[in-house]
Every structure is written in structure tokens, then in C-alpha cells.
Amino acid sequence: YEPKLNKKIVIEKIDTPSKSNLKIAARRCFDNMKKNGIRLGEENKYDFIFSIFHPFHLVPKAAVACGKELKIPVIIKVDDAVYQKAKGLKNLQRKIEKIYNSKTLQKGNRILVPNEYTKKLVHDYYNVSLNKISIVTNGTEIDNYKKSDLNSNQIIFSGAMYHHRGIDVLLESVLKVTKKIPDSKFVLLGDGPEMEELKKMVYGKEISKNVIFKGWVDRNEIPKYLSQSSIGIGPLRNTEVTRHALPIKVLEYMASGLPILAIKDTLPEDVLKNDENGFFVTDSVELSKKIIKLLEDNELRRKMGEKSKKMVTKFDWKNVAELIIQESQEVISLSK
């Protein structure tokens, strides 16, 4: 993956043991990340370090170690704060990870979280002082997204095919929808560990004419698919991972003027307002009813799509970037 970035951004690829296995590599990256981070810091005289947190990898731990050595502040951005609950050896692993994640976050100079729910979670679960936690939402470049063609019967999901996304719940609704609206299409963008099982489910239910797996799609192509759709699908399973989370894909749906459907208690209320820019549902049966309702009611679809477009303004990357700059300037001034 070679993203096109601003010429001022330099990518340094750090070799990591076990790099063919992402999860193992993420747990073995500390030494090389620390060593090279310190080297780069000494060469470039950075003002601060910015790191992205995830419960299973040690990059933020390496960032904190680099910050200590270089005597510069560390900002850590948290989106996925915790794992799903586990049993047996996995549960023991989670407990060990919680110990080092707690120490890492406690040593960070500023922790950025997307909302009040995550702020409280990071404070309670990792014992991080509320004084160092600030709310900075996720964002998207809303100018890149065109208003969707709300006259199509296309329902879209964009994202990783993980269990907690609940794509199986969406597939359970397909037959009910297609009986009522035979030409409806369910387009799935993305890849992941559940992909093959989901494909088996589609063939088993004989709904392959209405369900299209696109696999991994270049980010530049996503706006095109969204503009051809009428409904965006958010998280369809309520877990520790999805509860009150703010997936960027949902902001992209909103920027495209799509009504959104998601399982109750997943998306924050400033992203999905029930009956205003979409619906929260409780199961696949209610999901199918809401899809049918939206596809059959052009005016409702239009009004909800316009509400999504209006609500997404505060999540424009231009606004989010300003908040990150303010936080970094404050952290730098406090560290002097």
C-alpha cells in the first residue's frame, strides 16, 4: 500500500519481526520502533510524537519510550479503546495487554478520544486522568463526496469484514427485502476474516444475484460507490468494539447524503439521530423493514439524506485538523 501524501510527509518503513502476521508483528514491533523512532527524533528534532492506539499493538508504547528519551511530549489518539471480552488464554492475554496499555496511556501527555463515552471508558478502564483526555472526533474530507443518487435501490456497506460489524445480520435481511423489492442490490466494500463465511452464507441462501462482494477497494473509488447508493449500513452488532464508536465509513455515508441504518446503542447520537437521518434497529427483521420503508419512500429518503449531509459538517477534516493543531500546541507549550 503506497498512499499518495503531501510531499512534506515522509514515510519511514520500520522492519518488524513476524511481519507476515499482523497481530504477532504488532506485538513484536516495540524494539525496532523505539530504536528507529529515537534515531529519527535525534536527526529531525521533532516537537512532539503522535501515535494511534489499538489494544493489541505496541506502537504507542514505543512512542512513549521515544518521547521519554527525546524529552518531547507524546499525543495518543484512541478510537478502539478495548477488545471484546474473551475466555481462557485469550482472557489472560487481555489482562496482560491491559496492564501495559494502562501504563502507556498514563504516560502519554495528551490522549485524544472521539466522544464522551470513550473518554469515560479510557478513564475508568485504564485509570487515565481526565485532565489529560481531550475530545477530538474522527473526520472525513467531505468535499470529496458527491450527493448520492437516492433513486437507486442500492444498499451499501463499506468496511472490514469482522464479526463485530454484523454483516451476517445484513445478509439475514436480504430475502425479506428482495421479496418486496426484487431489484434491490446489497454492495459490500471491504475484506476481512469473515469474508469466506459470508460468501458461503450468500450462496446458501441463494441471494447471490442481489449481493455483490467488491472486496478491497481503493479509497479514491469509494465516493463513486457511495454516490450510486441510497442507504448506508453502519455497525449491526453491539459489542465493546462498536458501542458508541465513530467509524469513518459512517461519516463518508453522511458526506454522500445517505440515510444510515445501524443496531441500537452503537453509533453516537450526533452521528445517527433516530428518525432524523436514519434508524436504529434491533435485529435483522426490523432492519429489513426499515430498508423497505426507505426504498419505497423517496421523500423520506431525501429528507434523511439531507439531514446526514447537514450533520456531517462538524466532522470535516479541516475542522478536526484545527482541533488537533490546538491540542498539539498546548501540549508543546506545557512541556517547556
Question: PLM features: residue spans?
Answer:
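Nucleotide-activated donor-binding/catalytic signature segment of Leloir-type glycosyltransferases, i.e.
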Residues: 196-223
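Membrane-proximal helix-turn-helix segments that form the acceptor-binding/catalytic region
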Residues: 38, 58, 65-70, 82, ...
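Short N-terminal targeting/anchoring amphipathic segment
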Residues: 38-58, 72-75
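Carbohydrate-associated surface elements
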Residues: 117, 138-139
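Conserved donor-binding/catalytic core segment of Leloir-type glycosyltransferases
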Residues: 112, 147-174, 187
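Conserved acidic donor-binding segment of nucleotide-sugar-dependent glycosyltransferases
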Residues: 274-285, 293-299
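A short, well-ordered alpha-helix in the C-terminal region of glycosyltransferases
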Residues: 293, 300-314, 323-326, 330
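Acidic donor-binding loop of glycosyltransferase active sites
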Residues: 109, 226-243, 258-259
